[in-house]
Amino acid sequence: MVKAKGRAKEFQDPDEPITKDYDPEADVDVSEHGSGSEDSEDENAGTEHYVSVGKSKLRKSEGLSLGPQYRGSRVSRDALEEESASEEDDEEGSGDEEFDDPETADLERDAAEANDSEISSDNALGESDEERFKDYTFRASSKPNKPLSKRAKAADYMSSSDNEGAELGGSDSEDEEMDDGLDALVDGEGDSDDESDENDDEEGSGDDEEDDEDDSESDEEDSKAKAQNAKPMMAALSTQPDVDKGLAIRQQRKAYDGLLNMRIRLQKALIAANTFEALDSNPEPESEPYEAAEEAAIKLLNTISSLKDNFGPSHAGEKRKRELDVSMTTSQIWEQMQAEEERAIKSREDRLEKWSRKVQSVNVTGPKGLEGRNKTLISALRDQLINPDNRLAKRSRVPRSCAPAQAAKGVSEDNNIYDDADFYQVLLKELVDQRTVEGSSGAGAGDAVPTVVLTASKDVKNRKNVDRKASKGRKMRFTVHEKMQNFMAPEDRRAWEQGAIDRFFGTLFGRKMQLNEDESDDDMDVDVEEAGLRLFRN
């Protein structure tokens, strides 16, 4: 047994015999046949021949061995009773209070001291102290009639008109009452009657304050709900200009695609017009193809003229122009076309100037000099057309793809043709690039104007060399050797036969090579069984 230490040693009786604990239930034999024996027999039915192995070490519940320092010490009952008695005496001694002599005790003073912690500032002065402290003023000795009003919020001004009027009137009355209360506190004119009235008002106004708080909370919730509903509207309003710009750009793109479609379809007509110069100048006027072409040309000129009138400015009160007819001479047709061009040139220049100013950047750095900085688009176009040494104008008179007849004859320059192959190739290249980008991204394909069937090369998708049958790419990949390059199978181009080759190698160095054919014949004559028995004859 471990020796007692510390305080336990003081209560230890050296003469006390160590008694052994006795458990009355320890010697009771557990009956195998008791209540529930029938159930146990049913459970063990068919398994009587099994060997009982008992519980495993993992299933045995063993207590934790905390060590000898956690074991208790034996204490006698007398020592335990003495300790409890001493503790009760200490509690009784601490609970005793010192009382004064009842004959000399001042009960009123003792009651005042007992209630000193609960006295309020309003009842601090008694009736006997009024004369002594009548000239003194105690500030903030009473509670205000109503709490200070909260700071105004945006929700306070979002209520209905009736509530606004009531709230404004109530705030004025509250301000007046606050001013009166402050004046009374400063001057010291408030009396106990006013304070009692204020206390009564406070009790009566408690419900009103709760109602006001509920109203303010509901107003705040309404304002929050309105603010949340206004957020998507504000976001939609802020993004609306961007949406309008996007729609306008889409419409411009459609118009540009339509004009490019017209230019592509007019390519054959331009080639035919440039080919007229190379044909016979005196065709048969009575031929049927000539008349059909003339009617088609007059119809096309009328269509172009009507389009110019529709897009041009309206001229009210003017006489309706005469349509072109086959019976008109070439000079009359040319004069009418010149008149239409003069009427449309002013409107066309105004529109070009307007849109050039809109699309022009603010920080454009023009050429040096004031004239170059102030040059407009119209003046620049006129200079390009009037200048005879202009490179673009000269290039338009060189026959290429748009004038195949002159190009076949080797003509270097012809003033009667118009060939814009350079500009046309640039337009086609931009169209192919645009269709390629739209096809790869998958956007805008439905909005594009159908022009011509173009086979644009799509970007080849580089896919990784992944074995789909492997388990998450964990299949081992290896290369045995490099692929053979520039490999060709050998081809026998020799003129000698195999027998001649053997004879040549056999007669080299002046002697005949023995092929040991005789020895092979002798070996063939030996019996296989006889050769196998030689091992046992030795």
Swiss-Prot record:
Q: What is the lineage of its organism?
A: Eukaryota, Fungi, Dikarya, Ascomycota, Pezizomycotina
- Which organism was this protein described from? Gibberella zeae (strain ATCC MYA-4620 / CBS 123657 / FGSC 9075 / NRRL 31084 / PH-1)
Q: Where is the composition biased (Basic and acidic residues)?
A: 7-23
Q: Which domain of life is it from?
A: Eukaryota
PANTHER family recorded for this chain?
AATF PROTEIN APOPTOSIS ANTAGONIZING TRANSCRIPTION FACTOR (PTHR15565), PROTEIN AATF (PTHR15565:SF0)
Enumerate the subcellular locations listed in this protein's record, separating them with semicolons: Nucleus, Nucleolus
Q: Where is this region: Disordered?
A: 1-239
Question: Cellular component terms, GO, for this chain's entry?
Answer: nucleolus
The UniProt similarity line reads: Belongs to the AATF family.
UniProt GO BP? maturation of SSU-rRNA from tricistronic rRNA transcript (SSU-rRNA, 5.8S rRNA, LSU-rRNA)
**Matching InterPro entries:** AATF (IPR025160), AATF/Bfr2 (IPR039223), AATF_C (IPR012617)
According to UniProt, the name of this protein is Protein BFR2
Compositional bias of type Acidic residues: which residue ranges?
A: 80-105, 172-222
